[in-house]
């Protein structure tokens, strides 16, 4: 079975690859976390 944690890390990696400000990347990572938290319920 696919591990949500791995998908979360991939999502966050995409955020980091973008040439955004640190704040924007952080916001993007947070959205990933929120998305995967909802999926697990």
Swiss-Prot record:
SS bond list: 11-32, 15-28
Biological process (GO), any one: negative regulation of peptidase activity
Keyword Disulfide bond: yes
Gene3D superfamilies associated with the record: 6.10.250.1700
Keywords noted in UniProt: Disulfide bond, Protease inhibitor, Serine protease inhibitor
Job of this protein: Inhibits bovine trypsin with a Ki of 0.174 nM and trypsin-like proteases from G.mellonella larvae. Has no activity against serine proteases chymotrypsin, subtilisin and elastase. Has no activity against cysteine proteases from beetle gut.
Protein name: Trypsin inhibitor 2c
């Amino acid at each position: 079975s696919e591990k949500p944690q791995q998908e979360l890390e991939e999502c966050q990696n995409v955020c980091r690859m973008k040439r955004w400000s640190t704040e924007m990347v952080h916001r993007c990572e947070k959205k990933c976390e929120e998305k995967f938290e909802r999926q697990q319920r």
